[in-house]
Amino acid sequence: MASINDVCKAIVDDIDDALGAAVVDLNTGLLLGVHHNVPYFTTSFMDAVAAAAVEMFRGKGISSVEKRLSQIRGETVSNSMQEVQMTTPKTYHFMSVIPTKPNVLAILITGKQANLGMGWSGLRAAIEELEPLCP
């Protein structure tokens, strides 16, 4: 059986211009698995990326919006962020919560030569492999 790191490696190997892939625990911010081919993606850098992803999906800002929506709608709204695509001057970041594991996030980082559709397709296909491996 493959490990989370093996699946992350397969994502990076299969997608043109992929730089790295990771799986993050949204409760703790800990990396559950990672693979990259960029020398400056150090452990501390990857930890910072994981923490930023947690903030985007479960941070105070989104929690505040979800609380307000809950009040307006009269029903609980939580963990509403499912996918985010972020663009920086040189990279694309694809982030998706694993549907059956609502506290686990899969992340793909590519260069700008990557096709956006292929990035999403590759990450979503890998999620099926990641689901049984994640806590």
Language-model segments: residues:
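Non-catalytic interaction/Regulatory regions outside core domains
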Residues: 1-135
